């Protein structure tokens, strides 16, 4: 009979995720599964991402992107999920405040202050309301705000879901600008912020380094400015 005081204890695995920014609001989360958020990317980029799931925050063309052509299981608000199913895309419908779990990945749909009409092939369809997501995988919690203005219930998102990383739009005009995003970062309370939705077009031109300096000068929050295609590793 073995020594009961000499039982082997397996090493504790740290939570781990890779986050790759693919430009605009498109982000790839890589862990035991791959989640592609707002797939506004070209076909070549789609080919190498090989996502297990796609998440769409709202119906605008710069967020719905290639969701139809990718045809991977897609998480979206009910109206968008219905539209995608009609296009042959396997879809999981949900709504604001709801949570679903798919093969070890948890999706919670959060509010966003933005419009959400589906824009495809020159026509518009009712796309429900815009949303954000808190996505939890492999012990890491990520908040993708989608397109949104600042709203005070971002504090609740922080209190309820404790995201490790917040991806916040900073482009202004159609979403928050840098000043509002700085306040949003404080509301959410994530230790790391990744700016998104900027510099795609002149109308949303911003300097992300100014945003980074402003936050890091006045808070303990870190900001990671990524180049398109660049990846950051998250451990907790």
Question: What are these model-derived regions, one by one?
Answer:
Residues 36-38, 51-60, 74-77, 143-148, ...:
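Active-site neighborhood of phospho(di)ester-bond hydrolases with catalytic His/Asp-centered motifs
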Residues 41-85, 90-92, 160-167:
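Active-site metal-binding motif and surrounding structural segment of the metallo-beta-lactamase
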Residues 43-45, 60-65, 81-84, 98-101, ...:
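Active-site environment of divalent metal-dependent phosphoester hydrolases
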Residues 131-191, 196-203:
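Metallo-beta-lactamase
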């Amino acid at each position: 009979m073995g020594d009961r005081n000499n039982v082997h204890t397996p090493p504790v695995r740290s939570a781990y995720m890779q986050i790759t920014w693919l430009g605009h609001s498109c982000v790839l989360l890589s862990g035991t599964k791959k989640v592609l958020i707002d797939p506004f990317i070209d076909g070549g980029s789609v080919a190498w991402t090989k996502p297990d799931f796609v998440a769409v925050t709202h119906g605008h063309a710069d967020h719905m992107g290639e969701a139809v052509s990718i045809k991977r299981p897609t998480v979206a608000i009910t109206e968008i999920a219905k539209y995608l199913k009609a296009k042959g895309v396997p879809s999981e419908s949900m709504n604001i405040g709801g949570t679903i779990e798919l093969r070890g990945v948890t999706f919670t749909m959060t509010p966003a202050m933005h419009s959400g009409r589906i824009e495809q092939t020159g026509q518009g369809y009712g796309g429900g309301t815009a949303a954000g997501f808190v996505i939890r995988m492999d012990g890491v919690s990520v908040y993708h705000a989608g397109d949104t203005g600042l709203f005070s219930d971002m504090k609740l998102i922080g209190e309820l879901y404790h995201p490790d990383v917040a991806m916040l739009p900073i482009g202004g005009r159609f979403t928050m600008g840098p000043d509002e995003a700085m306040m949003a970062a404080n509301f959410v309370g994530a230790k790391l912020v990744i700016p998104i939705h900027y510099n795609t077009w002149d109308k949303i031109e911003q300097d992300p380094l100014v945003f980074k300096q402003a936050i890091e000068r006045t808070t303990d929050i870190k900001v990671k400015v990524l180049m398109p295609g660049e990846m950051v590793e998250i451990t907790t």
